[in-house]
Amino acid sequence: MSGKASGTKAVDPSDVIVIVLGGGRGSRLYPLTRDRAKPAVAFGGKYRLVDITLTNCLRSDLKNIFILTQFNSFSLNRHIWQTYSRFAPRDSYIDVIAAEQTRESGDWFQGTADAVRQSLRHALRDNPRCVLVLSADQIYSMDYRDLLRWHGEHGADVTIAARATPANAISPLGVVKVDETLRVVGFYEKPRSPDLVADYRVDQLPAAGVPADKPFLCSMGLYLFNTDVLADALDNDEEDFGKSVIPQTAQRRHMSCFPFDGSWEDVGTIEAFYKVNMDWRRGSGVAEAFQRGASIITHARQLPPSRIEGTLVEDCLIADGCHIHAQRLTRSIIGVRARIDDETIIEDSILMGNDAEETLGCFEIGRECVIRKAIIDKGASIGDGTVIDVPESTPDADHELYSTRSGIVVIPRVAVVPPGTRICGDP
């Protein structure tokens, strides 16, 4: 890499290092993150969350990528090796970096900024012009070359991607304040009320191009830094990009806002994860961009077509290698190699199926089960006659065999649910 000085030309993808933030313990996605890093969580019947981000990168000719993780990185490492080794040319790489002790730091990653700080030395070896910081728990389709072009044409030190957002949806996000050139002049992380950021509204700003019902620009957690600017911004003890690094850098550097008008979803919670999967099943929201031809790269399994016998199937996605004899499947996603026995009814659920490499358990739903609004993780076994059907008002809780989140039952990986079990929210 040449380490070219910043100017007004578009940034060449070969002069960019990508750092993908894999998250910490993933407590908000527990128990799906009990045995794996967040980027390795299964999604959409046959993918992993990290596949979305890496597909965006590879389609954008970005092929030098580090994925940062802190916990349970084995399955992620295996997936990356199985899937992406063939996409990296000899002089490129897609590597997983786990938190490590060094002479400079003996601690775990303390936040998003600290994770990049501790890992930046790996990226600096190639002297890139820019570093692109992404998150592994977001679902969207983007050609990052548009972002690189914007960054160069605006002569920015930092470019932050943002999207138009309704006032009632900004509280969990970072709100961006821009001037008429879309230069960032303020940043407010997670405002409790729209009144606190009333002067951040951009619906009267022609350059922002936002609809009247989405008057705020909110950060997507996607940052493109000139490398020297990133190193300077992290030369401190700040732990988080949104809370400290971005607001401080906006005051001292030229930070530009890249408006993104596509669909985007954060899947940091079980409720959000469930919703995005159901949108994916319907082909709505973020799924639309991928169904228009932006295929997703994932592990190429050599599986036969699924066999479905005597089952009424309505509005479902069914992956390869399944054996299904159920009575009815409705509004559900059935993952690879799932087995579902006779007279079983499944509604509004996500069944993750089974990996060929699993040595603990084999995903199977027994006879005469009724399963509604559940997420059943890989390798789980559900005994005959099991009923899973809790009220929407069921409190969030963790039990020996399952967890409940926002009225959704989650059965952990390789769990064994005995025959006749009733998970119905009964007192």
What are these regions (language model features)?
Residues 83-92, 180-188, 193-197, 282-289, ...:
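Proline-centered turn/helix-capping motifs that create local helix->coil transitions or kinks
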Residues 127, 141-224, 236-237:
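Conserved core of the sugar-phosphate nucleotidyltransferase
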Residues 24, 137, 269:
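Active-site glycine-centered loops adjacent to acidic/histidine catalytic or metal-binding residues
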Residues 67-69, 162, 375:
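Short internal beta-strands
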Residues 42, 162, 177, 224-226, ...:
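Short, well-ordered beta-strand micro-motif
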Residues 1-17, 205-213, 227-427:
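Left-handed beta-helix
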Residues 1-20, 28-150, 178, 393, ...:
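Conserved N-terminal catalytic core of the sugar/cofactor nucleotidyltransferase
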